[in-house]
Amino acid sequence: MKIDILTLFPEMFSPLEHSIVGKAREKGLLDIQYHNFRENAEKARHVDDDPYGGGQGMLLRAQPIFDSFDAIEKKNPRVILLDPAGKQFDQAYAEDLAQEEELIFICGHYEGYDERIKTLVTDEISLGDYVLTGGELAAMTMIDATVRLIPEVIGKESSHQDDSFSSGLLEYPQYTRPYDYRGMVVPDVLMSGHHEKIRQWRLYESLKKTYERRPDLLEHYQLTVEEEKMLAEIKENKE
C-alpha cells in the first residue's frame, strides 16, 4: 500500500516509524510519503487567508494543497479529507480502506478549508464528535487501524478478526500466565482444553460485554439462534 500525507507538520508522524506500522514499512508492505504543502505556497509561503464574507479564524488556501496534490505520483487513489463534519471513522471503514492500493490523507489546520479543496476528495472523514487542532492525529489513528489489516502485516489474520468491532461485538476477556495472580484466577473453562466450551464461553462473554457497555452495537447486529438464547440469559441475569 502507498500512503501520501499532505500536512503542515510532517514531523508529527514519527510514531508511524515504530511498532506494527514501522515493521510493515521495513517489510516493503507499506510506503508512506509526507508532503508539506507550505513548500508549495506561492504567496510568501502563506497557506491560510481570511474567509470571504468575514468570520472568525483563517482558512487553508486552495493553491498550496492543489499544487501539492498535483505533484504526487498517483494512479487511482482514495483521497481522504480529515474533517470534523465528515462521516465518522469506524472498524468497517478501516477494513474498506485496507483493500486499497493508494491512499492520500489531507490534514487541515486553522478554522477550516477553502471549499474548493473538497473537489479533490473522495471521502470526508471524522474521528469523532470533537475538534482537534489539526488532522494529523486523526490521520495517524486511521492509518494505524487500516495498516494492521493489510495481509501479512500481522502474522495471523485471525488475530485481528476476533478484535472488538471486527465481529460486530466487543472482544471477550483474555488471560495469560500465571493462573493465579494476587488471588485473581483464570476462569476454569479456559483451562479445560474443551474447545467447544471455550468457544461458547467467549461468545457469551463477548455478548455480555457488548450488552453492558455498547448496547447500540446490538441494534445492527444479526443474532444467531445461539446468540439470541445467550442474550436472553444475560438480560435475565441483569434483572
From Swiss-Prot:
EC annotation from Swiss-Prot or TrEMBL: 2.1.1.228
Keyword list, A-Z: Cytoplasm, Methyltransferase, S-adenosyl-L-methionine, Transferase, tRNA processing
MF-aspect GO terms: tRNA (guanine(37)-N1)-methyltransferase activity
Predominant cellular place of this UniProt entry's protein: cytoplasm
Domain of life: Bacteria
GO biological process: tRNA N1-guanine methylation
Keyword Cell membrane listed: no
Enzyme class: transferase
Reaction catalysed by this enzyme: guanosine(37) in tRNA + S-adenosyl-L-methionine = N(1)-methylguanosine(37) in tRNA + S-adenosyl-L-homocysteine + H(+)
ATP-binding in keyword set: no
GO cellular component: cytosol
Residues where S-adenosyl-L-methionine binds: 108, 127-132
Entry's localization field: Cytoplasm
Family to which the UniProt record says this protein belongs: Belongs to the RNA methyltransferase TrmD family.
HAMAP family: TrmD (MF_00605)
Subunit structure: Homodimer.
Cited function: Specifically methylates guanosine-37 in various tRNAs.
Protein name: tRNA (guanine-N(1)-)-methyltransferase
Species of origin: Streptococcus pneumoniae (strain JJA)
